[in-house]
């Protein structure tokens, strides 16, 4: 089985394509099937989120492009920027992942959230689309110009460490 574990900034050729919904692109360990039918194992450092268009190199040197799968979502539009901002506020208040587009929000399909958004005056339509939510306040995703563009997948600190009583003081 092909193992994908190195992220590249660019590649001269693509040897395969792996189409994944968002919930699988945020997993650090994953077994999946490429478009060709070949099984692959994806190993990333915990906290890494694969984005549409990311390129991974396999243990045998092959290059695989990640494509965001179309999945059931809601497209949220409003009559004014203020109204859309209110919708974004209430979604964030519920810790709901949201994609921010030009004049719209996109969220995963959820009937309760749809009812809330419609109650705020938003137009909510079902849409089969790639879901690319914001990475959050602690998300990374930047790179430094001048690097060689080849690096093992590294963690993106999406969440702060939660200290539990059982954690030993250092």
From Swiss-Prot:
Keyword Acyltransferase: no
Keyword annotations from UniProtKB, A to Z: Chaperone, Cytoplasm, Nickel, Nickel insertion
Gene Ontology biological process: protein folding; protein-containing complex assembly; urea metabolic process
Gene3D superfamilies: Urease metallochaperone UreE, N-terminal domain, UreE, C-terminal domain
Pfam families linked: UreE_C, UreE_N
Location of the region described as Disordered in the Swiss-Prot/TrEMBL record: 134-170
GO molecular function, one term: unfolded protein binding
Entry annotated with the keyword Chaperone: yes
InterPro entries named among the record's database cross-references: UreE, UreE_C_dom, UreE_N, UreE_N_sf
The protein, known as: Urease accessory protein UreE
